[in-house]
Amino acid sequence: MLIFNDLRHFLPVVPRFVYKSLKKHPRKFGLTEIVLDNGRRAEGRWREKTENLTHKKITKKHLLRCIKKIGIFNEDNRAGIYQTLHRISCIKNRYGNIVGLTYRIGREFIGIGPIIRDLIESNQSTLLIGRPGIGKTSFIREISRILSNEIMKRVIIVDSANEISGEGCCPHISTGKARRMEVQSINSQHEVMIEAIENHTPEIIIIDEIGTEYESQAAISISQRGIRLIGSAHSSDLFNLAKNPTLCKLVGGIESVTLSDTQAILRKTKKTILERKGCSCFNATIEINKKRTVKVYTSVEQSIDAILEGRVNNSQIRSMKLNGEITISLNYQDE
């Protein structure tokens, strides 16, 4: 597995003393974020720790210089660096002035595909879940590359903040031959998802960060039209996703059902229980918890039913070693 994150592009958009410190750092290639806050020292973030990069504090003047070079932030306070996968987000005070910047390091993972190759080659809609910053978007880029370059599928990426395909007129090479539809407003992402189907005849739609009621409904509509969907959502695990009132619709939704006395006795449960309301628009789910380890649920509906009924929920733990060897073990988990 090869990991690429070109830090050279940060030179124009961070203070020079921060870049010099970063360039000398022994673990610079494992960096996930750089944080610049007014009146504080520059901070570097890794998966397992955070540390100060400089002794010198960031001033308002430093931030203004960075902002001038970065350019315009969109309505969700994000910007990108041209022809890269990096993302910059800003923090504003109550007067609308920028007082902090977060630089997210965009990565290209080449070779992570084999760990989920069977799911990629199948015709299954797949949902990737995990906490923010765990690597869902990097997985999605590699899935897009394999589907469009190797399997030769017609793939369209609906890119809300150019986070999947990077900033610029042309999608980043890491996404393969997939076409990209940019979203002008974060409130119109669901409309672009439907537009992609109606106008461009894709076989597969890819979308990052499904998070609103409208986007969930659009995902359901896409699945009902027979289009394969690859998406991601923020959640620590499938159990918490099923409890989320907005995102639970992606896996069929949950409703309260009252049983008769006889049914309750036969099921050995309470009279009022929770059941899956409908069909899931995703067939499989991939939980990303570690860098090279994923938990795979090959049947979302069976897994959700098991969670709601308190039964043992079977999943697969898949890991990739540094030498490329893949191990798969069954995980018997009682939710």
From Swiss-Prot:
The keyword Magnesium does not apply. It comes from the Eukaryota. ATP binds at residues 130-137. It is found in: Plastid, Chloroplast. SUPFAM superfamilies: P-loop containing nucleoside triphosphate hydrolases. The keyword Protein transport does not apply. InterPro entries: AAA+_ATPase, P-loop_NTPase, Spore_III_AA_AAA+_ATPase. One of its GO terms (cellular component) is chloroplast. GO terms for molecular function: ATP binding; ATP hydrolysis activity. Keywords: ATP-binding, Chloroplast, Nucleotide-binding, Plastid. Belongs to the ycf45 family. PANTHER family: KINASE-RELATED, P-LOOP CONTAINING NUCLEOSIDE TRIPHOSPHATE HYDROLASES SUPERFAMILY PROTEIN. This is Uncharacterized protein ycf45. It comes from Cyanidium caldarium (Red alga). The lineage of its organism: Eukaryota, Rhodophyta, Bangiophyceae, Cyanidiales, Cyanidiaceae. The gene is ycf45.
